């Protein structure tokens, strides 16, 4: 049975534009730390350079740190398959400027088992700080004809048992009953190769407000 394709994306737009994306290794490895163990990703900077640059902006700035995996979309007829979704959710303080969608028709990548791809709203260029990881092949998310699909940009190297564990967690509430009742904390996201290149943009979530003195 085909899964719903409406994927939650972020709200708000940053007001500044980061510098041009630096050159990266052809494959950039990133580790996502969770309470259930690490997930290691290989990001395909050769075939999806803009999407990888966007994701690494969040990683190198620490914008994913302390966020969560908050959605589990299971296939109704085969619940061990589907995708999990994580990222900044609707935290507009952490969002980076939008970027053009790199479709699978452009990159040659496909939504196979263990693919990481960008979540977005209905607008093709609305991807930002939320992503999903597939369990099982999901060709319905690939570009086809006038349908742009979603921006696949890498794959899981290790940690599929962690992903499957998150996929199996209880859900309910919004997003068609797919929101995790207890989101799984994304403790930190760190690159394992290449050189970090922070965007240099402001990090308002780190700014602590001072208590006003009592009168």
Feature map (PLM): residue ranges:
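Cyclophilin-like peptidyl-prolyl cis-trans isomerases
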Residues: 16-215
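Bacterial N-terminal signal peptides
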Residues: 4-14
